[in-house]
Regions:
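A structural detector for beta-sheet-dominated domains
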Residues: 6-8, 31, 36, 53, ...
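SH3/SH3-like beta-barrel fold
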Residues: 5, 40-43
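Short, mixed-charge low-complexity intrinsically disordered segments
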Residues: 43-63
């Protein structure tokens, strides 16, 4: 499954300042996706969580 996350502009700017570069949107190959509290969680090789407050939108595609 392919997970695409489009982060909010504020988060993108913060990441660029912190790391020097940041690609938005981020695309991940994942095994599963679910919501838990205020987080979007997915299983890649381990469980990864993103704060929903940082996300503008996201979508999943099979394949």
């Amino acid at each position: 499954m392919r997970l695409t996350i489009v982060f909010k502009d504020e988060f993108e700017e913060h990441m660029k300042k912190q790391f020097g570069a940041f690609t938005n949107p981020q695309v991940y190959g994942v095994k599963s996706v679910h919501m838990e509290g205020g987080y979007l969680c997915s299983t890649i090789s381990d469980t990864v969580r993103w704060r929903m407050d940082d996300i503008s939108r996201f979508y999943c595609e099979e394949g």
